[in-house]
Design a protein with these regions (language model features):
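Short, conserved SAM-binding/catalytic segment
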Residues: 90-100
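Active-site segment flanking the S-adenosylmethionine/decSAM binding pocket
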Residues: 49, 55-67, 85, 135-197
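Active-site-adjacent beta-strand anchor residues
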Residues: 80, 103, 159-160
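Hydrophobic packing residues within well-ordered alpha-helices of enzyme cores
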Residues: 70, 90, 116, 169-170
Length: 242
């Protein structure tokens, strides 16, 4: 099992490591789905293939598969992940690389300790959104504080996949201060509610439109990328860089 990077290099994953092996065998981890998006679907190639010397943010880094994919395109990647078990695997997978920094925190709307919910049916769904799961306390960082803490002056590409937490982290108040610093984003939007009065698919559309409004009001342009649920937004500044 391996990751095919943005430059086409093949990096084998150490399945002799019991923790890594068990994570990929655990149906609740979605690790194989994430790997398929990277290796087979190549969903990030349009933005990163054969690029060099980029500053990249990996928000919702999980165990670091996207970070591993993108490291060839980066002068440095800052990977944000609040789940302790994912952090442990991330360090095993990306530990050898000098251009990778793991940020043990959650992107959020405020700079304070936050309740973070560990999903019992799918560890990929861990989130700041309460889905009735176990709770831990994690550090919360806004975009502005994240960039200031790590002395990041410019971001070429920011991937965000944080399982509903985007509804708290991506607001006009958090995005305006960093508009001049973040050029391009790839945002996966998630449903944060489902019940007898609303399907999760309908809630996802509502959430996506809220994010679209934020992006427009801040000054970004965007497009909805083709996907099963139309849940992925490509965010950019200049129509000529689309």
């Amino acid at each position: 099992m391996s990751v095919i990077t943005s430059s086409g290099n093949v990096i084998s994953l150490d399945l002799d490591d019991t923790d890594i092996y068990q994570h990929f065998e655990d149906s609740k981890s979605c690790a194989k789905i994430i790997l398929s998006q990277i290796n087979s679907d190549r969903i990030y190639d349009r933005f990163l293939k054969n690029q060099k010397d980029m500053i990249i943010l990996d928000i919702g880094a999980n165990i670091g598969l996207f970070t591993l994919y993108a490291k060839d395109s980066a002068s440095h990647i800052f990977s944000v992940e609040p789940t302790p078990s994912h952090q442990k695997l991330f360090e095993k997978i990306n530990g050898p690389y000098d251009n990778v920094t793991l940020v043990k925190a959650a992107l959020s709307g405020t700079d304070e300790s936050m309740n973070f919910y560990i999903c019992d049916y799918n560890s990929t769904c861990n989130s700041l959104i309460d889905r009735g799961s176990d709770v831990i306390e994690v550090e919360g960082l806004t975009f502005k504080s994240l960039l200031e803490k790590y002395n990041i002056d410019h971001v070429d590409f920011c991937k965000i996949d944080i399982e509903g937490s985007e509804m708290l982290a991506i607001t006009e108040e958090t995005l305006k201060p960093v508009y001049d610093k973040i050029d391009r984003m790839f945002i996966e939007v998630h449903a944060t509610y489902s019940g007898p009065d609303m399907r999760w698919e309908d809630n996802l559309v509502i959430n996506r439109r809220k994010i679209e409004t934020v992006l427009q009001n801040v000054g970004y342009k965007y497009e909805i990328l083709p996907s099963r649920y139309n849940d992925t937004i490509h965010v950019f500044k200049d129509i000529h860089t689309k």
